[in-house]
């Protein structure tokens, strides 16, 4: 039952993370001595094959203490989906479902990804989860917002990350911020991304990311040509936690 619930939560999280699919390991002892590194870049690798991998380990809080983990991996080769790869995170096999590989995985301090296809290892990398989920502090579900007006989103600080990202979704109207520095605790969504009134419901969410830095926005481009914290293909591998989605009603 727990695994089924966790998988449902994972699939729900995919709806609110259009850009993220979404790691470099950090030395926390150095970070404590010198202060947080708010700039930099994930380790970049030149691809050695024709695959593209978008991989993330997602931390989900089920209320039992600590974070449980899910894996979400999308694989393509020359633009075509790959649905018969062997995807492993540590000792867990991540099964293909829907349009990608999604399943719960055992909780660990470090998540080692290995992907094989047609008898060859095509991708390797490792990821770590942020320490907790961000919490949106200035908005509650049911709040009313004005059409075409800017919206300020504030959230709690999360440790063990390299960047944040803020999203707003309504049907196909999607806003995704650039990658924000780890010392950011607020972001303003421009009013142009709230063009529909009459009580339209917009879902607001904050992603806490371990792996990609504010200088790594190219990781989400369709014409990506390198691998971010993943060796073999182009693409990226990150650890991720997400705030609870806040539903804001937009009126004229």
Pin down the residues of each PLM region.
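Bacterial N-terminal signal peptides that target proteins for export
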Residues: 1-10
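Bacterial Sec-dependent N-terminal signal peptides
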Residues: 2, 17-57
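Bacterial N-terminal signal peptides
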Residues: 9-19
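Short, ordered, surface-exposed loop/turn motifs in non-cytosolic proteins
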Residues: 69-70, 75-91, 162-164
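Edge beta-strands of extracellular beta-sandwich domains
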Residues: 120-130, 214-225
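Proline-enriched interdomain boundary motifs that mark the N-terminal boundary
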Residues: 133-141
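Short helix-loop boundary/capping segments
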Residues: 140-193
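Beta-strand-rich modules
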Residues: 195-220
């Amino acid at each position: 039952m727990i695994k089924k619930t966790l998988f449902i939560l994972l699939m729900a999280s995919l709806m609110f993370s259009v850009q993220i699919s979404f790691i470099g390991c950090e030395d926390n002892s150095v970070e404590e001595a010198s202060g947080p590194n708010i700039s930099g870049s994930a380790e970049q690798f030149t691809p050695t094959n024709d695959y593209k991998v978008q991989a993330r380990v997602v931390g989900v809080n089920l209320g039992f203490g600590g974070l449980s983990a899910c894996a979400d991996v999308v694989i393509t080769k020359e633009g075509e989906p790959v649905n018969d790869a062997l995807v492993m995170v540590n000792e867990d096999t991540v099964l293909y479902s829907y349009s990608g590989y999604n399943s719960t995985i055992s909780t660990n301090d470090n998540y080692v990804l290995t992907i094989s296809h047609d008898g060859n290892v095509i991708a390797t990398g490792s990821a770590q989860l942020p320490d907790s989920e961000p919490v949106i502090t200035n908005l509650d579900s049911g709040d009313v917002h004005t059409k075409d007006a800017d919206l300020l989103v504030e959230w709690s600080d999360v440790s063990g990350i390299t960047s944040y990202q803020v999203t707003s979704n309504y049907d196909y109207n999607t806003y995704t911020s650039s990658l924000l520095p780890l010392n950011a605790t607020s972001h303003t969504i421009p009013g142009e991304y709230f063009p529909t009134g009459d009580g339209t419901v917009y879902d607001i969410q904050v992603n806490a990311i371990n792996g990609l830095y504010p200088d790594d926005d190219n990781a989400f481009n369709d014409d990506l040509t390198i691998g971010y914290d993943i060796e073999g293909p182009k693409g990226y591998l990150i650890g991720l936690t997400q705030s609870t989605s806040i539903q804001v009603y937009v009126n004229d």
